[in-house]
Amino acid sequence: SSDVCSSDLTTWQAIHHLFIASARAKILAKKIMPKAMLGAMYATSPSYPKTCHPDDQLAWMKQRRRLFYFSDVMLRGYYPSFARSFWDEYKVTIRMEENDEEILKEGTLDFYSFSCYRSTTIGKDDKLGIIALPFGENPYLKSTPWGWPIDPVSIRYVLNEVYDRYQKPIFIVENGLGEVDKPDENNFEIGRAHV
């Protein structure tokens, strides 16, 4: 399965422990370095509904929820309302310790950083995962030799979406092209378009 989570309780429980470890690290770091800002890096792939069909729109919305599952917990300090539906879908029950909710709330991250390489389209027939995204083609975009779309609008879309969601600083830490790197004017033009 391309979905790293599937119905494996061990994976889901490990993800919860990752959230707790991150929050505890943030709490400790603030004691040691009160002015420090801590964050995490997320692979953030912009996506569009494959068509305007309502079922494609619903599939797209579900995938956006999956995309933000990790950052919602780590930047907001609590599980989003849709988390329980994921757990039900995968037939898992997360075991939480008595003070886990307080730890998550106290240890929220200060910024969102992300990598962004390609956009995709999401349709009703695509297999949705927590980690893996389908690689749907967008007929409105040119592609690299690897078949990755060149989509400078998507970086703006992600910046707006993430800021609207968290109202915290954002850092773009990777914005690749998806082909063999070699200095040429085409790469510079694509970079300029993204800026």
Where are these regions (language model features)?
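Active-site region of glycoside hydrolase catalytic domains
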Residues: S1-R192
